[in-house]
Amino acid sequence: MESSRGPPRVKNKAPAPVQISAEQLLREAVDRQEVNLQTPTQRFADLEELKEYQGRKRKEFEDYVRRNRVRLSNWLQYAQWELEQKEFARARSVFERALDVHPNNTQLWIRYVQAEIKNRNINHARNLLDRAVTRLPRVTSLWYQYLYVMEMLGDIPGTRQVFDRWMKWQPDEQAWSAYIRLEKRYGEFDRAREIFRAFTAVHPEPRTWLKWAKFEEEYGTSDTVREVFQTAIQTIAETLGDDAVDERIFIAFARYEARLREYERARAIYKFGLDNLPRSKSMTLHAHYTTFEKQFGDKEGVEDVILTKRRRLYEEQVKENAKNYDVWFDFARLEESGGDVDRTREVYERAIAQVPPTQEKRHWRRYIFLFLFYAIWEERETKDIGRARQIYDTCLNLIPHKKFTFAKVWVAKAHFEIRQGQLTTARKTLGRAIGMCPKDKIFKEYILLEQKLYEFERCRTLYEKHVMYNPANCQTWIKWAELERGLDDLERTRAIFELAVSQPILDMPEVVWKAYIDFEEEEGEYERTRALYERLLEKADHPKVWISYAQFEINIPDEAEEEEETEEEVEEKPVSEEAKARARKIFERAHKSMKERELKAERVSLLNAWLAFEKTHGSAEDIEKIQKQMPRKTKKKRKLEDDTWEEYVDYIFPADDQQTKNLSSLLAMANAWKQQAAGGAGGAAVDEAAQGGSS
């Protein structure tokens, strides 16, 4: 069992006294290596014995090929053995028999040809290659072997004939390139041009034309280079279509003209390519054009190139999807940066004409920003206030307010009117918004506007309408109360808070209660604060409320302390014993309430807060008293509705544990009494149980 668990552990990890080197390990491995078995050398005494051996081997090979004719290795081994015996005629016979079985096997043809070449039978090898390429004209390795043999023999006309035969089968580009390299090696450039013409007719791809153009740059004139490029563009467009024209042709053509210092020709080529190629296929062309203008153009030309490029990009994108508002944003910013007012206005008008197809708010969220940006641009850049106001009105009339609205549009329109000094129009705009489609944000902005103008009566009216519209919004009640408190109307503030806490539905009622309690505490109304805490506990008997209540009692100064306090006094006084006693009563009430309702987790959090309080303000006895009430954790399991079990943490309090023990003692006494009544022999047990219970 120990060995099956893994390799043995090394207990002593100290270095060994004798170290083993890598050289020693390799030497031992070589010394211990077993010697491979070697076939003993056969020696033949005379020719008759050799013939007998050859006959026996031939019979074995014949048996092999007869049993499995389709296995190529048998034929190759047979032929190779005959070659080793210098029996070339027999070897040819074996190869020919193998070709009858495998006439399309490239490896067999190549081995046959190599055998003839090795034995200097060149004519036979040439005939074999002729047969091979006739039989398998699509196998490039046979053609290359044939061409290699012909060129090594110095038969260049024969090599051309082989190439011509091969080119009739329209091979791949490498074959054409090999033919061209042959003519270049022997200085036949006119023949190479003719090959290029046939090459581009068979493979009219851009890279083929680029190879031809590069050839003409090396061995031709500028006119022939231009002719090649022009023919390439025209031929590719006619045979493969306009989309097949590659940007690399324009780039190479323009760079060639730039090298000749024909900058106007190069610029015309770049522009022609950009105008006729789609943007997705002219990215690199545009990058080269930009570089060209930076090198040989002026600043305006460079900026125009960049703007044109991006403008083409955005035009294609909006053509594909006119409802892509993010593209319209970028398009408008581009025209703004260009400084052309008419172009910018045209883009904005085209953009806002793309009304969302449905009346769903999610489709309108990006669309309305087009109006906002358009109006701001008209206001700031062109100073056309009338057009900006018209844009806002168009947007508001276009939005289906019965289904949804956008507060930001109403607020932007109001701020616009304020900037123009039209305060009445701004109020009418916000009032119209509240009347048509009230929203919390509109109320908030309207109230903020009136507060800045110190129109507090208008603020009160707006707050009244706001709480009528949405009485569950706690922040509205709190802001209203803060306004009244700032105006030093405490009774109105209390009335607002009372209305708020009496609402049946609030989104965050605890926030309102806290604001109300903080208000009374800051005003020094401690009895009112206590009453609020008691009312809150009736609604929400939560540990946080009890803890906050206790903290409040600690922070309340006594009457004597209130009289002694002055505004200049900054020293912090210790907490009085009366405040500590009040806080302890709160903790005791809370603990009793949670104990009766068996709220264990809440009870633990309360005890932790109580213990922290005693550590800060209590004595050692008080701390020990609370620590004795702290529970211990235990893990239990409970059954779920789907008949599975889950593990949870439960708390066992010392008081509850003692009650359980007392109940167990009582049950033991009852059980003993039952046994005594049944058999009469349990008196001793009853006495022992009674003693245990009394103890």
From Swiss-Prot:
Family matches, as InterPro entries: HAT, HAT_Syf1-like_N, HAT_Syf1_CNRKL1_C, Syf1-like, TPR-like_helical_dom_sf, TPR_rpt
This protein's GO CC annotations: post-mRNA release spliceosomal complex; Prp19 complex; U2-type catalytic step 2 spliceosome
Chief localisation class: nucleus
Keywords: mRNA processing, mRNA splicing, Nucleus, Repeat, Spliceosome
Gene Ontology BP term (one): mRNA splicing, via spliceosome
The UniProt record lists the keyword Repeat: yes
Cross-referenced SUPFAM superfamilies: TPR-like (SSF48452)
HAT repeat ranges per the UniProt record: 52-84, 86-118, 120-152, 154-185, 187-218, 220-259, 261-295, 305-337, 339-373, 383-419, 421-452, 454-486, 488-522, 524-555, 578-616, 621-654
Subcellular location(s) per record: Nucleus
Regions crossing the membrane: none
Subunit structure: Associated with the spliceosome.
Family that this chain belongs to: Belongs to the crooked-neck family.
Record function comment: Involved in pre-mRNA splicing and cell cycle progression. Required for the spliceosome assembly and initiation of the DNA replication.
PANTHER family: CROOKED NECK-LIKE PROTEIN 1, PRE-MRNA SPLICING FACTOR
Name assigned to this protein: Pre-mRNA-splicing factor clf-1
Biological source species: Neurospora crassa (strain ATCC 24698 / 74-OR23-1A / CBS 708.71 / DSM 1257 / FGSC 987)
